[in-house]
Design a protein with these regions (language model features):
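N-terminal secretory signal peptides that target proteins for export/translocation
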Residues: 1-9
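C-terminal motif of bacterial Sec signal peptides marking the signal peptidase cleavage site
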Residues: 22-23
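Extracellular mucin-like PTS domains
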Residues: 33, 39-72
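Beta/coil-rich, acidic/histidine-enriched accessory regions frequently appended to metallopeptidases
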Residues: 76, 103, 107, 333-372
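Acidic/histidine-rich, surface-exposed loop or edge segments in extracytoplasmic proteins
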Residues: 80-99, 194
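Zn2+-dependent metallopeptidase catalytic core
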Residues: 93-178, 207, 211-214, 221, ...
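Active-site-proximal alpha-helical
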Residues: 112, 252, 256-260, 273-350, ...
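Zinc-dependent metallopeptidase catalytic helix centered on the HExxH motif
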Residues: 169-275
Length: 372
């Protein structure tokens, strides 16, 4: 059994190694050529992640300036996002997470950020398979949070008997993005949590999931309303397609991630059609269920992610990738969800979904004709 101090030290060594790696890495792995300009902030300041050293069971942090530059053309006409810090993310991993998993996570995160623009600050926390190492990761989380933000509430926002930021990922795997853009803290950031149990880092799905989560960062970075657990939060939810309504946010993240992955070197040419064919199995249950797509929640017994992915594929086929990813999100904050939807997709969301619901009744072979 490795004692607590040794485990934290192992975590810290991974952080230091990865920080060095992130400076040496970059977008050279990215093969996608996107015709449209990228919708990013114009801020040139880039603050990198922290290196961590152990001292009496606490962590100390020193900042290093990142000199990485993005070679892709950037859209300088977008509003100045709150998430305007460029540079590689901070990565923290449990001591039982392999270096290859850390490297793979960073690689596919950077492929996505190179294609869609850099937004941050962001932190990636990779959970392992052991409750013991997760406990140490939770301790590190609290140390980092309280060091970066004096307003951080240790009693409620560090791991306790009622809540943990990472524990469920040990058994369930998965991934998520949390937006810490809140009125009761001073340091605002994105939290990307990766649970490598499902999908495994050895699977192609892990690469896609990493990019899927980055697209959620892209989405949230285009919304200026702060989370105040009140009116501003409600507006923020509305701009994501509705509170607890995954149809647009998840559909967009999934389709854009799958599309980007399909363009990478050595990915089979029919990959995207195969994925969308698989997702088409959910169409029948959606049509039979009878509940409007916009009203489906995460708890409904319908694969809303799959239907949302097909909806976004349908939108992209109608108006183009640039209109969906760049123009819609550029106007989202100022116009609101529905008005930006009408402006760029030619009709309101209810009308477009009604049209889509008729379209997906066709044989799957016909549907797949819109997939590149």
């Amino acid at each position: 059994m490795v004692n607590k101090k040794q485990q934290i030290l192992r975590i810290n060594k991974l952080i230091i190694f990865l920080l060095i790696f992130s400076f040496c890495g970059g977008g050279s792995e990215t093969s996608e050529t996107v015709e449209e300009a990228q919708d990013t902030t114009t801020t040139t300041e880039a603050q990198d992640t922290t290196t961590t050293t152990e001292a009496q069971d606490t962590t100390t942090t020193t900042e290093a300036q990142d000199t990485t530059t993005t070679t892709e053309a950037q859209d300088t006409s977008t509003f100045v996002s709150w998430a305007n810090v460029k540079g590689p993310p901070m990565i923290y991993a449990a001591s039982d997470v392999s270096q290859s998993t850390i490297d793979k996570t960073l690689k596919w995160y950077e492929i996505a950020s190179s294609a869609w623009g850099e937004f941050g600050p962001a932190e990636i926390w990779i959970v392992g398979n052991s409750k013991e190492t997760v406990s140490d990761l939770e301790d590190l989380w609290c140390d980092i949070r309280t060091e970066k933000d004096k307003k951080w509430n240790k009693e409620w926002d560090c791991a306790n008997e009622y809540w943990s930021p990472f524990a469920r990922y040990v058994d369930d795997g998965g991934a998520a993005v949390s937006t810490y853009y809140r009125d009761y803290i001073d340091y605002h950031f994105f939290l990307v949590t990766m649970g490598p149990k499902y999908p495994s880092p050895d699977e192609d799905d892990y690469k896609v999931v990493t990019m899927h989560e980055y697209f959620h960062i892209y989405q949230h970075a285009h919304i200026s309303n702060i989370d105040d657990e009140g009116p501003s939060s409600a507006i923020r939810d509305e701009k994501m397609g509705g509170a607890d309504k995954p149809w647009f946010a998840e559909g967009g993240a999934e389709y854009m991630a799958q599309l980007l992955y399909s363009r990478q070197p050595n990915v089979r040419s029919n990959y995207l059609k195969e994925i969308m064919d698989r997702k088409a199995y959910s169409i029948g249950e959606y049509l039979d269920y009878g509940k409007p797509l916009k009203d489906l929640t995460y708890s409904d017994p319908v694969q809303t992610y799959d239907i949302g992915t097909w909806l976004v594929a349908y939108i992209v086929d109608k108006v183009g990738e640039e209109t969906f990813r760049v123009n819609f999100y550029k106007d989202l904050d100022g116009l609101g969800f529905e008005e930006s939807f009408k402006k760029h997709f030619g009709m309101g969301s209810d009308q477009l979904i009604s049209e889509f619901d008729e379209w997906i009744k066709q044989p799957v072979d016909e549907l797949l004709k819109i997939i590149p």
